[in-house]
């Protein structure tokens, strides 16, 4: 079920403040470190880089216009799929 339109997109307040500060700092601001995977990417985030925590390490996410409306966590995968085990019978 989608979020109701009248509520607007969810963004953690501390993340919004950090993004505004980074916009004011300009190009000299580094990536914004965040644990808030649940925050929606809004147009003010375009051009910024976030380090999003995936449960083990921080994954750099550079925000582009196509990402607006998605969640930050969508771009920092939490699971690693190493592939299926090789077929032992076929190796003979």
Curated annotation (Swiss-Prot):
Gene3D superfamilies: 30s Ribosomal Protein S19, Chain A. Keywords: Ribonucleoprotein, Ribosomal protein, RNA-binding, rRNA-binding. The keyword Transmembrane does not apply. It comes from the Bacteria. Pfam families: Ribosomal_S19. SUPFAM superfamilies: Ribosomal protein S19. GO terms for cellular component: cytoplasm; small ribosomal subunit. GO terms for biological process: ribosomal small subunit assembly; translation. GO terms for molecular function: rRNA binding; structural constituent of ribosome. Belongs to the universal ribosomal protein uS19 family. Protein S19 forms a complex with S13 that binds strongly to the 16S ribosomal RNA. This is Small ribosomal subunit protein uS19. It comes from Novosphingobium aromaticivorans (strain ATCC 700278 / DSM 12444 / CCUG 56034 / CIP 105152 / NBRC 16084 / F199).
């Amino acid at each position: 079920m989608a979020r109701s339109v009248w509520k607007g997109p969810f963004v953690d307040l501390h993340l919004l403040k950090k993004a505004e500060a980074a916009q004011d700092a300009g190009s000299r601001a580094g990536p914004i470190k965040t644990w808030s995977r649940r925050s929606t990417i809004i147009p003010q985030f375009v051009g910024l880089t976030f380090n999003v925590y995936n449960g083990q390490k921080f994954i750099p996410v550079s925000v582009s216009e196509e990402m607006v409306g998605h969640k930050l966590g969508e771009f920092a995968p939490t699971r690693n799929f190493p592939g299926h085990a090789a077929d032992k019978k076929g190796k003979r």
